[in-house]
């Protein structure tokens, strides 16, 4: 994270800095923090699920997250020992339904699934797109449609309007491991065929650094979840804008270990109860996320 970044970085980290270097070092080193905020009443169908999956009741599980996506998962600006966001609340609601608590392990986005596979985390609820490629490393319970936004500097000086030929010659900032990376790379041959320069990629570990790349003039665009892009525009209305929203053929999913199908089924069943109770929709509204992202859950595996 670069210094002097402005509103969004200040929103995420000012409180942590004020806590002192030792406290900040502890946050970075331990990376296991507690959630913030209480959940709505547990749905009535959850009692039967706790009876069906008794091994989960009373447990404390670890959720691996990349806490740099305001609205989804971020450090609480009022208390750097806590996390806040839609994914945090959704995970807590699922945990309440099944009788377990969650703690959090913060990692880079690229390390989310490896952290899960190594046993350092039990679950990943961190705005991660479920793809067949990623399903080789984990099973997914999908719960959200995907719409990406194209973030650009105010006035869109490069005239970028999507993952198309307007991207030719542009510098795109992206998160390492994000599905948008190969989409940008795939434009290279198409641009060459059209007699245009290929787009270039700058890879970063989190959303805030990608946004900073545009603010600093190093990058021309950042393509990511439309709600993340909208949050960036809200933070920097005089410096950034959303050029367009594009449909991406993926869903957001909860990742669980491939060798724990019973746990996967339990999470799926709990998510269904949470949705039936209206909690999922309430959380979308609470965090000012697009309710059109809502989808009924499904399972995605590599098979």
Segments from the language model and where they lie:
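Ligand-binding clefts/hinges and TM-proximal coupling segments of bilobed small-molecule sensing domains
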Residues: 41-44, 48-51, 179-196, 242, ...
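A ligand-binding cleft/hinge motif common to bilobed small-molecule-binding domains
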Residues: 110-114, 128-136, 185-186, 215-248
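Short helix-initiation/N-cap motifs at beta->coil->alpha
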Residues: 86, 104-114, 158-159, 198-212, ...
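Bilobed "Venus flytrap"/periplasmic-binding protein-like clamshell domains
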Residues: 67-70, 81-96, 128, 149-206, ...
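Extracytoplasmic small-molecule ligand-binding "clamshell" domains
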Residues: 41-127, 286
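Extended ligand-binding regions for polar small-molecule ligands
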Residues: 43, 88-97, 156, 169-171, ...
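Acidic, polar ligand-binding/catalytic clefts
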Residues: 101-165
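Periplasmic-binding protein-like
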Residues: 145-152, 230, 234-272, 290-303
């Amino acid at each position: 994270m670069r210094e002097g970044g402005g509103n969004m970085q200040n929103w995420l980290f000012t409180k942590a800095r004020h806590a002192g270097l030792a406290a900040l070092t502890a946050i970075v080193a331990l990376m296991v923090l507690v959630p913030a905020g209480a959940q709505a009443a547990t749905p009535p169908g959850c009692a039967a699920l706790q009876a069906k999956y008794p091994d989960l009741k009373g447990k404390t599980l670890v959720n691996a997250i990349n806490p740099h996506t305001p609205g989804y998962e971020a450090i609480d600006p009022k208390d750097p020992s806590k996390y806040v966001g839609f994914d945090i609340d959704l995970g807590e609601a699922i945990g309440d339904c099944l009788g377990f608590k969650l703690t959090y392990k913060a990692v880079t986005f690229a390390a989310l699934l490896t952290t899960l596979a190594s046993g350092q985390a039990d679950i990943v609820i961190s705005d991660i797109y479920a793809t067949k490629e990623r399903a080789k490393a984990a099973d997914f319970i999908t719960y959200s449609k995907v719409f990406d936004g194209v973030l650009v500097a105010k006035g869109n000086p490069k005239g970028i309007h999507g993952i198309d030929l307007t991207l030719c010659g542009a510098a795109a900032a992206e998160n390492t491991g994000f599905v948008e990376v190969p989409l940008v790379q795939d434009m290279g041959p198409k641009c060459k065929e059209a007699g245009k320069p290929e787009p270039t990629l700058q890879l970063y570990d989190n959303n805030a650094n990608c946004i900073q790349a545009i603010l600093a003039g190093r990058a021309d665009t950042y393509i990511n979840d439309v709600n993340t892009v909208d949050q960036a525009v809200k933070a920097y209305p005089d410096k950034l804008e959303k050029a367009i929203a594009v449909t991406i053929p993926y869903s957001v999913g909860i990742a669980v270990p491939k060798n724990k199908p019973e746990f996967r089924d339990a999470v799926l069943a709990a998510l269904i109860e949470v949705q039936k109770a209206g909690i999922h929709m309430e959380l979308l509204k609470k965090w000012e996320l697009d309710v059109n992202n809502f989808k009924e859950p499904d399972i995605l595996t590599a098979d």
